[in-house]
């Protein structure tokens, strides 16, 4: 049986002689034209430690695909470092890079008639961008995550990149010495690999394991470790078998599979960005999945992993404790996973987990049993109210003050808000309203890790609320609400809030409310005028023109 189902369109027949000439220039032989053409979307980059260790994974995938009878075709995908661009205009390109990555992979795979694709990525948007492309093209595919960074250390404490962000607030508030500030900066990131807590990169990679399009244990391996190279090689072998069986992403990514992925996100305390990305992933798969489905899942899936940012441990600790397979086994036995979902290996979820113990090891405290869950319900809540009738996203577990009503401190950009925080002008009880930062208004929904971390560092993480139509980093915690929809730029109520207005965030009632009369809101709405777009040319302008509302994933098509 021929396995070059697609690539034969570009390699076979008399009319394709010029095509073959170009392949011969790259060392191909005649027999190679009967083999599958397998794309390797390589996200290697020296921009960020998240991606600086990916080339070795691409190299082993190339060798393995050749050895298994395929023709590897390598092409690059871009990346943006969320951590480095945070707090700058560059952060506006982060979410946009999700769309660019998806478009790049779709363009290469379909333009070159590839028979399958292995996607390698590291930083946050690499994962959803790659998955969206895999689902759009729907050729046999597998995701190879670059792996997590190892924790840093300073004076006996484990560090992550969030430690450095929070140190900024502590230092400016006079709560940290210069020695400790410099020590944390120098030691927070000790190796290659993606940010080490259950932040966005590790959240998305973990969910891809649960989804069935990444190999077991692959999402919690550290990039510097040899097992990560071994996992990449095995991923390439599995992909060749999937090509032979014509097992495609849309055979695997069903509504039930998305429920499995979201269950793992809830159980591990994952990033708010997962809400946005899975709306986009479902859209690419043409699956009916809405923002309200996250709330439905939250109510039935407990948090069973004690992981940063709100918990104690990092991804390497989770790996030692049994990784995502152990988390999934606990959920499966509790009836919280669909065991009949297919995975890229050809096994069902239940078959893949058959050898995993039902009870996590007693010599670890990372993964809990259901009866000893950290929180009885999930942490990613969908709040609604007159400030966000389409819904917005908040992390609500572990809050000492689940309800806050306070005066609005209104900022139309991130930088003025950050200046106010650094000048100690924000006080306990305030509710920061940061707006015109949505998909169209930002544009690009920049993340607010810099201001939220500064608040935490100043000791205000539990006593100040923050509302935005932008996003939050996976490293954010506290009384923060993002993805407010409709956004300010299209006339959402968040754009009508005035300085000093009373605003309520109620995590118990899942309510977000501007405490102003309907008549007053109507008056303000009648007087509101849409501001001029911040960008009129280039990729930011393109995204602003095309992006959907955050409640539908901020997708472009």
Curated annotation (Swiss-Prot):
Homodimer. GO terms for molecular function: 2 iron, 2 sulfur cluster binding; dihydroxy-acid dehydratase activity; magnesium ion binding. It comes from Herminiimonas arsenicoxydans. It catalyses: (2R)-2,3-dihydroxy-3-methylbutanoate = 3-methyl-2-oxobutanoate + H2O; (2R,3R)-2,3-dihydroxy-3-methylpentanoate = (S)-3-methyl-2-oxopentanoate + H2O. Functions in the biosynthesis of branched-chain amino acids. Catalyzes the dehydration of (2R,3R)-2,3-dihydroxy-3-methylpentanoate (2,3-dihydroxy-3-methylvalerate) into 2-oxo-3-methylpentanoate (2-oxo-3-methylvalerate) and of (2R)-2,3-dihydroxy-3-methylbutanoate (2,3-dihydroxyisovalerate) into 2-oxo-3-methylbutanoate (2-oxoisovalerate), the penultimate precursor to L-isoleucine and L-valine, respectively. InterPro entries: DHAD_IlvD/Edd, Dihydro-acid_dehy_C, DihydroxyA_deHydtase, DiOHA_6PGluconate_deHydtase_CS, ILV_EDD_C, ILV_EDD_N, IlvD/EDD_N. This is Dihydroxy-acid dehydratase. It is an enzyme of class 4 (lyase).
